[in-house]
UniProtKB/Swiss-Prot annotation:
Name of the protein described by the UniProt record: Ephrin type-A receptor 8
InterPro entries: Eph_TM (IPR027936), EphA8_rcpt_lig-bd (IPR034287), Ephrin_rcpt_lig-bd_dom (IPR001090), Ephrin_rcpt_TKs (IPR050449), FN3_dom (IPR003961), FN3_sf (IPR036116), Galactose-bd-like_sf (IPR008979), Ig-like_fold (IPR013783)
Species per Swiss-Prot/TrEMBL record: Mus musculus
Record PTM: Phosphorylated. Phosphorylation is stimulated upon binding of its ligands including EFNA2, EFNA3 and EFNA5. Autophosphorylation on Tyr-615 is critical for association with FYN. Autophosphorylation on Tyr-838 modulates tyrosine kinase activity. Ubiquitinated. Ubiquitination by CBL regulates the receptor stability and activity through proteasomal degradation. ANKS1A prevents ubiquitination and degradation.
Cytoplasmic face of the membrane: 563-1004
Length: 1004
């Protein structure tokens, strides 16, 4: 017999707890599979063994029936009492939740059950595809969890009828079979199951971004997301496939894609509604319906376009948003001016343009031999200048008319919708009568004789003299100089001799006839070259030749004497081994080319100018050295730079049969001057002569369009100085030397061609995606536009002082050696990661310091070999500077011998007075301390903001500062790389100053 069970009265168990256990309807997104609170009477669950769980039916204080399952076998050990639910279909759910409401007795409140009473129970489940009835076994169930009560009641609670209800929820899954059972296992607790609700979660149906999403059951586990594809609502279409994800909590997450209302519909309250009358929408999208344009209407709802009103039309290329227009009225104020057998017609635009601006004009010519009521077409012999139809201007010349004939001219105004109108076109009409005709053109003209100073011509009478020819007029001029001057000669016969011409000169001759009706047209041009002059030397000529020779000998003798006496340089004259390129009239001199066959190691005695300024028209130079590109092949995408006279854009060049090529487009701004256009085309002509991997490549030019454009290859990383500043400290020394080697190779190529750049700086070097550096900017304009401080203005023009050799500043004379000086400054810029040369010194301070012998110190971490090469480039005597071929060979050697780059340069002397604020004379104090403080030193190098950092780090004297290294500076919290370099560079300078204890200070 089973041991006696400690059982509580059902009334004491459930009466008070009943109110708390009443049914709560499923929350939003929850679907109940089982809810015992809605079951009246016995739940019909299976219990095992028989003396375990008891089914209790009671009523609460309101006399409502209450059903529970209770167990309280706390006196006996090893309890194993099972309570199983009926079979529950899962209804497609992959994960369900069990909400259990129960009460549990505190074991401490029951005497004598210390070893047998428990305060927990187990929850199990079993899946099956059908109802198994009572044939389930314990071993078939899978445990879900062990459940303990948050609150348990005691005997005192029973006395006051206050029981403590517990609610626990457990997830069950993943489920795959058609249904399942839940089972409660009692192991010795005193508890009562008041209700059980089994449910699953789902995401509710909704409309989002005009896409309808149906209900979706959540996933099999708590972290899964179920993808659901939406369907566009009525009258909408997909822009991007609409999708959302249903979370395990029954919430919609991560909306992707959307639908948009179709043409003729607009979005209103998650639906697409038809456009009202008088409104339209021409394309699918988010936009709302728009009101019909002027002179149009929509006859039905959901209109995609608006129909034009009567007598109004819309051209084929007009967008649906354009107003409907109509043909223009007739031109007004038509006047004619008859000149013999030609007439000039002029008129004013129509008073009513029809709402359009694309007005052109057509001319209709009718010949009326007898009366204006009997007219016929003028025929193909009539000539219209510039044309008969599609005239843009309001004037026309009609020639080759018959003499003494009546004509009627109709001038029509048409626009883009004139062809759509069935109505006759409006026209202005004028009737005229021609006068006597002028003679026709002289067709045949030939040379009869040509001497040194005269030419005899012979020609035939015009085929249509149209009267008595009174005289002939001969027009002649030197070839290509007609616009400068020409002369005329009259003749009464068909033969004439023109005298007073220059010997050995090519002349152009034209002839025309004149009658009482006027002059005919000039004949076709005929070229004749006069005879070459015979050499004659009279006494006067011989005397002049002798005087010239004697004068030359005297001048040569004086030059030799001056040379022996060591005549010095003057600002007006320079050595004859280099051409002097002076600025004149405030304009920059043209680029200079050396002969192509001169030895690379020497400068020729004479430099030849082979650039666009030698052409009378820069456009001819451009055609000689550049390729014309059709403007339609260029697609501009964005502006990447701007200057005073132009803009630089990024775009793509369409190449037939190939992919589009990314290019940079330099375009002149509207309103440019002729001088700016000439300089612009000259720069293109210069670039077109170069072909080198380290010179920016010219793709072509556009000169025939509205805007002049230069098209070059696109360099992704922009200018070298800005690129280095952006990537401060990110490259190895070998990489930096490789960049310099590319710039040097490009300059060697230019030098070998005899080209002097004159504006070499890091800002004028471009970098592509493979870190290849290419020399650019051959117009000497960028620095002067972008940074006025970078140019020093003299009476002769502007010079980029910080990059220019001293002799070029002093005498305005440029050479390949001055380009070498500039290359040395570029080397310093690269090793200093784009820092400004000479920092904040004024231009005048730079000039004075360089003249005194100061040279830029080595940047932080600069190899000694590279700084020595810089100093060689900055030699005061330009003849001692290396050639670019030597510079490239040195850089090649350094790249192939990285170990030579390990020794870093040191600053051994103090900078000039212009740098006094950043260089202390520490030797005066002996120990290096003197009266100077750390704060004074920081202020002098403009780093006073870090006073507190040094004080907090314990650096109270300059002696302690001198022992700092890069790690110490970073440890103070100074994170900016540029500020670290500036502080460490100043410390290095002070150390070097202390080490130099012998002799006076000298400049580098």
């Amino acid at each position: 017999m089973a041991p006696a069970r400690a059982r509580l009265s059902p009334a004491l168990w459930v009466v008070t707890a009943a109110a708390a256990a009443t049914c709560v309807s499923a929350g939003r997104g929850e679907v109940n599979l089982l809810d015992t609170s809605t079951i009246h009477g016995d739940w019909g669950w299976l219990t095992y063994p028989a003396h375990g769980w008891d089914s209790i039916n009671e009523v609460d204080e309101s006399f409502r029936p209450i059903h529970t399952y209770q167990v309280c076998n706390v006196m006996s050990p090893n309890q194993n009492n099972w309570l199983r639910t009926n079979w529950v279909p899962r209804d497609g759910a992959r994960r369900v939740y069990a909400e259990i409401k129960f009460t549990l007795r505190d074991c401490n409140s029951i005497p004598g059950v210390l070893g047998t009473c428990k305060e927990t129970f187990n929850l199990h489940y079993l899946e099956s595809d059908r109802d198994l009835g009572a044939s389930t076994q314990e071993s078939q169930f899978l445990k879900i969890d062990t459940i303990a009560a948050d609150e348990s009641f005691t005997g005192a609670d029973l006395g006051v009828r206050r029981l403590k209800l517990n609610t626990e929820v457990r997830g069950v899954g993943p489920l795959s079979k058609r249904g399942f059972y839940l089972a409660f296992q009692d192991i010795g607790a005193c508890l009562a199951i008041l209700s059980l609700r089994i449910y699953y979660k789902k995401c509710p149906a909704m409309v989002r971004n005009l896409a309808a999403f149906s209900e979706a059951v959540t996933g099999a586990d708590s972290s899964s997301l179920v993808e659901v594809r939406g369907q566009c609502v009525r009258h909408s279409e997909e822009r991007d496939t609409p999708k959302m994800y249903c979370s395990a909590e029954g919430e919609w997450l991560v909306p992707i894609g959307k639908c948009v209302c179709s043409a003729g519909y607009e979005e209103r309250r998650d639906a697409c509604m038809a456009c009202e009358l008088g409104f339209y929408k021409s394309a699918p999208g988010d936009q709302l319906c728009a009101r019909c344009p002027p002179h149009s209407h929509s006859a039905t709802p959901a209109a995609q376009t608006c129909r034009c009103d009567l007598s109004y039309y819309r051209a084929a290329l007009d967008p649906p948003s354009a107003a409907c227009t109509r043909p223009p009225s007739a031109p007004v104020n038509l006047i004619s001016s008859v000149n013999g057998t030609s007439v000039t017609l002029e008129w004013a635009p129509p008073l009513d343009p029809g709402g359009r601006s694309d007005i052109t004009y057509n001319a209709v010519c009718r010949r009326c031999p007898w009366a204006l009521s009997h007219c016929e077409a003028c025929g193909s012999g009539t000539r219209f200048v510039p044309q008969q139809t599609s005239l843009a201007q309001a004037s026309l010349l009609v020639a080759n008319l018959l003499a003494h004939m009546n004509y009627s001219f109709w001038i029509e105004a048409v626009n883009g919708v004139s062809n759509l109108s069935p109505e006759p076109r409006s026209a202005a009409v004028v009737n005229i009568t021609t006068n006597q005709a002028a003679p026709s053109q002289v067709v045949v003209i030939r040379q009869e004789r040509a001497g040194q100073t005269s030419v005899s011509l012979l020609w035939q009478e015009p085929e249509q003299p149209n009267g008595i020819i009174l005289e002939y007029e001969i027009k002649y001029y030197e070839k290509d100089k007609e616009m400068q001057s020409y002369s005329t000669l009259k003749a009464v016969t068909t033969r004439a001799t023109v005298s007073g011409l220059k010997p050995g000169t090519r002349y152009v001759f034209q002839v025309r006839a004149r009658t009482s009706a006027g002059c005919g047209r000039f004949s076709q041009a005929m070229e004749v070259e006069t005879g070459k002059p015979r050499p004659r030397y009279d006494t006067r000529t011989i005397v002049w030749i002798c005087l010239t020779l004697i004068t030359g000998l005297v001048v040569l003798l004086l030059l030799l004497i001056c040379k022996k006496r060591h005549c010095g340089y003057s600002k007006a004259f320079q050595d004859s081994d280099e051409e002097k390129m002076h600025y004149q009239n405030g304009q920059a001199p043209p680029p200079v080319f050396l002969p192509l066959n001169h030895p690379p190691g020497k400068f020729p005695e004479t430099q030849f100018s082979a650039e666009p300024h030698t052409y009378e028209e820069p456009g001819r130079a451009g055609r000689s050295f550049t390729r014309e590109i059709e403007a339609s092949r260029i697609h501009i995408e964005k502006i990447i730079g701007s200057g005073e006279s132009g803009e630089v854009c990024y775009g793509r060049l369409q190449v037939p049969g190939q992919r589009d090529v990314p290019v940079a487009i330099k375009a002149l701004k509207a309103g440019y001057t002729e001088r700016q256009r000439q300089d612009f085309l000259s720069e293109a002509a210069i670039m077109g002569q170069f072909d080198h991997p380290n010179i920016i490549r010219l793709e072509g030019v556009v000169t025939r369009g509205r805007l002049a454009m230069i098209v070059t290859e696109y360099m992704e990383n922009g200018s070298l100085d800005a690129f280095l500043r952006t990537h401060d400290g990110q490259f190895t020394i070998v990489q930096l030397v490789g960049m310099l080697r590319g710039v040097g190779a490009g300059m060697r190529y230019l030098s070998d061609l005899g080209y002097i750049h004159r504006d070499l700086a890091a800002r004028n070097v471009l970098v592509d995606g493979r870190l290849v550096c290419k020399v650019s900017d051959f117009g000497l304009s960028r620095a002067l536009e972008d940074d006025p401080e970078a140019a020093y203005t003299t009476a002769g023009g502007k010079i980029p002082i910080r990059w220019t050799a001293p002799e070029a500043i002093a005498f305005r004379t440029f050479s390949s050696a001055s380009d070498v000086w500039s290359f040395g400054v570029v080397m310093w810029e690269v090793l200093a990661y784009g820092e400004r040369p000479y920092w904040n010194m004024t231009n005048q301070d730079v000039i004075s310091s360089v003249e005194e012998g100061y040279r830029l110190p080595a940047p932080m971490g600069c190899p000694r070999a590279l700084h020595q090469l810089m100093l060689d480039c900055w030699h005061k005597d330009r003849a001692q500077r290396p050639r670019f071929a030597h510079v490239v060979s040195v850089l090649d050697a350094l790249v192939h011998s990285p170990e030579s780059l390990r020794a870093t340069a040191t600053v051994s002397r103090c900078p000039p007075p212009a740098f006094a604020r950043s260089c202390f004379d520490l030797r005066a104090g002996g120990s290096g301390n003197g009266d100077l403080t750390v704060g004074d030193w920081l202020d002098s190098i403009r780093m006073g903001r870090y006073r507190d950092h040094f004080a907090a780090g314990g650096y109270s004297s300059l002696g302690m500062v001198l022992r700092m290294n890069a790690q110490d500076v970073r440890a103070l919290g100074i994170t900016l790389m540029g500020h670290q370099k500036k502080i460490l560079g100043s410390i290095q300078t002070m150390r070097a100053q202390l080490s130099s204890t012998q002799g006076p200070r000298r400049h580098l």
